[in-house]
Amino acid sequence: VGVPVYFQSVLSDGTAEGRREAFFLIGSFLALWIIAYGAVQAFAPRLLGAKGQPATETTRKAILWAGLLVPVPFLLAGAAWLAEGPSPLLTATLILGLLAFGFVFAVNSSVHSYLILAYAGSEKAAEDVGFYYAANALGRFIGTLLSGLLYQWGGLLYALIGSAVMLTACWLITLTLPDRRSDTRLGVLDT
């Protein structure tokens, strides 16, 4: 929530026309970002060389890629703190940071989608996957709500710090993923 609101504040001059132009610029950027995210997510299995690898190796990759996410919002929060307010340099830094974050997050998401299937029991895989996506939706809702509240309380800096803290918690939880099923070789990522 915080980043698009920040972009609106720096791209709009406050007039109706300025708000409209900013709206379409931000919307177009985010649409292209989502399309690129999907392309990276689709390509991630090849990028990771995931074909036929055991679930334990994929678990190690989940830990690695979740860990790679953590510094991005911390670095962006540092940039926001140093900028002490909106600036062209901060805006450019945020755009580059969003691109880097989107790439790493898309790979991470692909790995997690595989792992939910690898860890699901075959007799209740649909139920396990359903719970995963329900938890995912709830997490997105809480993240969106928290991001908006943090932006209201402390601007972009607080929203980015909140993101960094939540990603750190995610990474710490990922460290506890079991290495069971070390012999599992699902064809899910065989693309």
Model regions: which residues?
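Short amphipathic helix-loop junctions that connect adjacent transmembrane helices
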Residues: 2-25
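Multi-pass alpha-helical transporter architecture, strongest
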Residues: 77-80, 162-191
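Intracellular juxtamembrane helix-capping segments at the cytosolic ends
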Residues: 107-120
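C-terminal transmembrane helical hairpin of 12-TM major facilitator-type secondary transporters
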Residues: 59-109
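Loop-to-transmembrane helix entry/capping segments in MFS-fold secondary transporters
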Residues: 23, 120-132
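Transmembrane alpha-helical cores of Major Facilitator Superfamily
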Residues: 31, 35, 130-138
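Transmembrane alpha-helices of Major Facilitator/SLC transporters
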Residues: 26-51, 72
